[in-house]
Structures are given as C-alpha cells and as structure tokens.
Amino acid sequence: MSLVPFSQLWRGVRTRGPVEQASSSSSSSSSSRRTWYAPARSQTGVQVAAYEPTAVLQLAPSAVSRRSTPVRSSIIADLSSSGSGDGEGERGDATGSRDEASSAFAGSSKVLKINIDLLLWRCRTSRIRARQTLDLNERKSLYKAAEDGLRRCLALDPADPRAYVVLGKTLVQQKRYDEARQLYQDGCANTGNVNPYIWSAWGWLEARTGNVERARKLYDAAVVVDGTHACAWHKWGMLEKGQGNFTRARDLWMQGIQRCRRKPQSQNAYLYNALGCMAAQLGRVGEARSWFEEGTRSAEGAASVALWQAWAVLEAKQGDPTVVRYLFRKALGANPRSRYVHLAWALWERRQGNPQHCLALLRRGCELNPTDPALYQAWALVEKQAGRIERARELFEQGLRADPSDLYMWQAYGVMEAEQGNMDRARQLFQEGVWADPRSPSTVYVFHAWGALEWQAGNVQTARELFKAAVRVDPKSETTWASWIAMESELGEIERVDELRIRQAERQWEFVVPAGFTTRPAPGLVDTLARFFSARGFGSDGNGSSSSNGGAGGQQAGSEAAAGIRAADSVDLTVDGGGQLRFKDVERLVESNDLSALPDFLSSDDDVEASLRPPGAAGRRQQQPAGSGTGGDNINGSAGYGKLQVPSLVPRPKATPLRSMG
C-alpha cells in the first residue's frame, strides 16, 4: 500500500467547494467512487476515477480501465506520478493545474447556442455604438471589443455563419479588405460551402474592390446554394447595372422576384425597389410607379423604408407636394431615424423654398444619426447659402469628426474656403482629403476641385498635374475632362486640346439601352413563365398569388399539368405571336438561370400599355361601379394612366414625427 501526498492526489481533478466536500465526506464511505471530468491540454474532456477523501491521507486510486473513455498518456502520467518538494510549491502546482484545467474544460464542452447568440448580440451592440459615437478613441475601442467578441464566437463554433458575416462587415467598414476576404474564404470552408450569406457578402466585397468577374462567380454560387436568397439577386443585378448591362440586371431582379415569392421576407422589397429605380432612371415614370406600388402591397414591402423613399424621390420630380410629403411620411413611419429619408426630404424642402422645414429636418436627422457626414454636409451648405459662414465651418468640422474619411466633406469644405478667398486653407483641406482615403475612387472630386483652384490661381502646371491625377483615378469623369480641355483652350493650346479630346474618346464609354427596353415583362413572356411555374407547382400558393397579367391562364395550365405529370413534358405553350414553345424548352432555359435566352415574345398585337400598368389595376377599374368617380381618377382629376392615383389606399397616419412640417 503506497501513500500519495494530498496535493498530488488532486492534481488536475475538478472538485467541489470546501463546504460541499465536508458534507459529502461525512455521509460517504471511504470506498465510494465518483466520476469527474479531468481536462487535457488538447482541449478534450476525459473521464478519470477518483476517491473522495475522508481523512488526511487516502489510498492511491487504482489504475483507470482502458475499456472506458480513452485517456491521454500525459494525463495519466500527471495523475499517477508522485512528486517531492515543499508543500507550498506542490499546492501552487495543483492550483495552476486546476486553473488551466478549468479553462481547457470550458473550451472542450459543448457550447450552448444561446451563449453564442448573446455574445453576437453584444458584438452587434458594440458595432452600432461605434458607428454612433463621435469620440474617435471610443470608436476604436468599441470596434476592437466587437472584433474580439466575434473572434471568440468563431473559436466557440467555427461552423456558425453569422459570426463570419458580421465580422467581415466590421472589417470592411474599417477598410481591411484583405482580412475580410480571407475570413470569408475560411467561412465558406468551415460551413461546407452551403451558406448563401457568406457567398453574397464575399461577392459584395469583390464588387466593391473592383473584381467584377470574381463577384459574378460568388453571386452565382450564392443563388445556386439558395435560390430564394433575395440579397444575392439584388446585389448581382446592381453589379450588372453598374456595368451597363440593363437587360441582364432586369432579368436577374425579375428572376429573383419569381424565386423569392415563395418565401416572404423583407429583402424582397429591394428587388422591386431596384426595378423601380432603374425605370425612373430611364425616364419610364409609369413603370417605376407600377413597381413601387406592387412592392408596397405586401406586408414586408409596406415596412420597407427603401421603397417609400425611392417612390417619394420619384414623385418629387413630378411636382405634387401633397403626394411627396405623404410618401416621405410613410417612409419615416417605416423607419423614423432613416438618414436617407431625412436628407432627401430636407433637400426637397429646400428646392421648394422652405428653408425652415429643411433646417428642421436636417437638425432632426443629425440628432438621430450623429455620425452621418452627408447630413452635416447638407446642413453646412444650407448655412453657407444663407450667409452664415462660421456656422457652416462648425458643421463641416463636426462632419469631419463624425467620419474623417468622407471625401465629399473635404471637397465641399475646401470649395467653400476657396470661395471665401482662403486659398491656403482650401489647399490644406484638399491635401488632407486625399490623405484621408487615397485609394477611393471618390478622390477624383478632390483632385478636380483642387485643379480648378490652381487654375484660377494661375498655377497652370500644378493644375495640369491635378487634372491628370483625377483622370487617372476615374477616366470616365466628364467634368474633369471638360475642365481640363477648357483650361487648355483658354491658354490657346490647340494641339493639346485635340489630344485631350482623343484621349477622352478612347476612355469614355456610355450605357446603351436596347431599343424598346422595358422593365415590365411582355404579356406573352409572363404568360409562358406563369404556366411553367404553375406546372412546376410554383404558381399561386399560400403566400400570395402571382401578380403577372397571365396568372389566370397559368393557374389553369398548372392544374391540368398537375393531373398528369407525364403529360407535362409534351405540353405546347402557345405564344401570343403565334409560335409554339415546348414545355421542355422553357424548363431547360429557366433552370439554366438565363431568361435572356428566351425568345422575344413581344409582337405587334401585344398591348404594351397594358403591360406597363400595375398588376390588378385593370381588374379594380372593372369592378368599380360606373357612378364612382375615384377609382380611375388620378391626382389631377383625369382618368389617363401615367399619373399617380390619390394615395388613399393606405390611411394617412394621425401622428407623424414631423407633423408641424406637413
């Protein structure tokens, strides 16, 4: 019988407190055996057998059976080895072993999901607070706390995709693009390449850094993983639109609407918003209104601030103040602190000649969003226009403290100082603006303003170098080319002017919109696709019926195909133009995610105007009694299409955040 020192016996074994040990030892015999968890240095929990002491000395435990839970040899050696030395040193070794064991055991045990959720919530709160604080040091500390917490989440559960997305967004906000790219790559590998959120976030990063082809592949991977991921469809369409591919962007957004209609979610509203904004950009006001109206019909769309704000901006160009204010109020009802709504509404009130309303909106927007530089810049420009230069300087300084990397703020501040005759101060502001974010494409505005300043000051050579730097950053900047050519023409440099015009023509490219392009699908194409999706079981479901014009015919074809699946392959879909399109052809084209490969179903017999109307509008007009004079009337009292109807479908809110401004 060998005796083992007390401190050595309990090395590496988790025990209870002194009170619990005393109560346990008084009620248990010396031969009672209990099972404890002893941690290993390899972050693996193992079981060892130990005796609970009933006296000062205790018999050494018997050897652990290898038929039970496997135990590493290092742990067995630590538990069975006997040491010599003074008692204080041994107690110190035991204490250190228990502390190390506790931390290792915490990492080895299965982490509850609620603990990760709470940690993610704290990190999200820290990130939001960092974006809302004006103290630079506090902002850095909050970002550091959020990053540390998110990396802790990844250490606890490397397969949780939420931590990768949030941490990547945090890194992108700090312009740490390489780290974010590596993080997304690790996230895809650790989650089995099946999470669309990581793919979509990675694609947005590549699109932001100018890697268009790589972004396309990543967005394609996101929609392959999950066809109902509206975010990927929206970002992919925005990428194609930025490259001038309007048809491809429209097809992607419409395909996203068809796919995501089965899954009601708030992100679907951005697809309608993108189509409406593209129609408004191309001057098709009727189509834009149709998309905005269709998007706001659902509960998710009615709660989307982006739809209401874009609709209000569209109507602001049409000149009806009542409708514009109503739509802006609806936008603030969806998000009372939206910085975009406050800014757009304030600028519109300024154009309407209401400076007090404009200042009230800007003041409220800055109070709700203290770190948004665009609001400070707009407020400063309003004060400058009113002749309050000192107040404008204060607002510019506040905006720079809110976001020192905002190049638009540096440019506007420098232009104001140049207009006041402070040339040296303007040069200093332009230089600091270039230093703030030298890799940003927005530096073209700073270089252009600086070059115009040097041109007016008579420093022609310096102005040439600044204009050259501007076109190097953005070769498509028409304003920079025009200013440079105007300066050379003023100096009489005819040969240099011709050379600049040739260089501009070589570097310029414009978006070419196809002839007859429309964001509303042709009736024949909608009818064919509706029949296809109905036959596949995607027609009208519990989430809401299809809003296409050919929905009734599609439902009938779908019911017939559902009666016999074998007959579906031989169905011929009649096109309005008179041609025949077999069901298998449509199935192959749609499943290939390329609607642009479908033939043009638009014929001379198609009612193009009917396709531009919002779905269901004709039905509502037919159901309305003849004596009623409100259903088909627009704001001005006429019955023609193209005017926004009186927005009485949704009751006007009784209380608005800015009621005094109505």
Swiss-Prot record:
Compositional bias (Low complexity): 23-32
Source superkingdom: Eukaryota
Disordered: annotated segments: 14-38, 75-101, 540-563, 598-662
Compositional bias per record (Basic and acidic residues), positions renumbered to this chain: 88-101
Molecular-function GO term, any one: mRNA binding
Transit peptide, residue positions per record: 1-50
Alphabetically ordered keywords of this record: Chloroplast, mRNA processing, Plastid, Repeat, TPR repeat, Transit peptide
Repeat region (TPR), residues: 126-160, 161-194, 196-229, 231-263, 269-302, 305-338, 339-372, 373-406, 408-440, 444-477
Single Gene Ontology BP annotation: mRNA processing
Database matches in Gene3D superfamilies: Tetratricopeptide repeat domain
A cellular component term, taken from the record's GO annotations: chloroplast stroma
Classification via InterPro entries: HAT, Mbb1-like, TPR-like_helical_dom_sf, TPR_rpt
Entry-linked SUPFAM superfamilies: TPR-like
Oligomeric and partner information: Part of a 300 kDa complex that associates with RNA.
Record function comment: Involved, directly or indirectly, in the processing of the chloroplast encoded psbB mRNA to its mature form, acting via the 5'-UTR of the psbB mRNA.
Name of the molecule in the record: PsbB mRNA maturation factor Mbb1, chloroplastic
This protein's encoding gene: MBB1
